[in-house]
Amino acid sequence: PSMLAVEDYLFSLSWLRSIGGLSAMINRCDKNAKVIFNFIDEHDWVSNLSSRLDTRSNTSVCLVFNDRRIENPNEFANNVCFRLESEGVAFDIKSYRDAPPGLRIWCGGTVETRDVESLMPWIKWAFESEISLLNSS
């Protein structure tokens, strides 16, 4: 590997140590995921892809839209993702190709909780915008 890659690795380890190590990283992941789990609890049109609490990820949180008005879930999820990307607030947020249509939000320890908190109103806006288009047709 190049010396830049080695230096980047050393810098990352130093940063990790400075915030409290592994337990701090796990705590950051838990806090980030909790923001999304709370959002899900507050909105009946979205749910966690995993219905089992013991299999939910705290790093790659996957959401599905469960509103009955959505006739084409894949198209709807694509449109929500496109809206978010067009506004510059979320990139590469679409669920994996082989997963059910929805959103995939990275909540790893390098993500700031305030950024996850800032994303939630945008997801609500994109959802409501797309639903309003369904209602108008």
Language-model-detected regions and their locations in the chain:
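Glycine- and other small-residue-rich loops at beta-strand/loop junctions that grip anionic moieties
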Residues: 1, 94, 108
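Active-site C-terminal subdomain of aminotransferase-like
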Residues: 1-39, 52
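Surface-exposed helix-capping loop/turn segments at secondary-structure junctions
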Residues: 19-20, 43-49, 131-136
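Conserved PLP-binding catalytic core of the aspartate aminotransferase-like
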Residues: 34, 47-84
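A short linear hydrophobic-aromatic micro-motif
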Residues: 46-50, 89-95
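Small/polar glycine-rich anion-binding or flexible loop at a beta-alpha turn
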Residues: 53-60, 96-104
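PLP-dependent enzyme catalytic core of the Aspartate aminotransferase-like
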Residues: 97-137
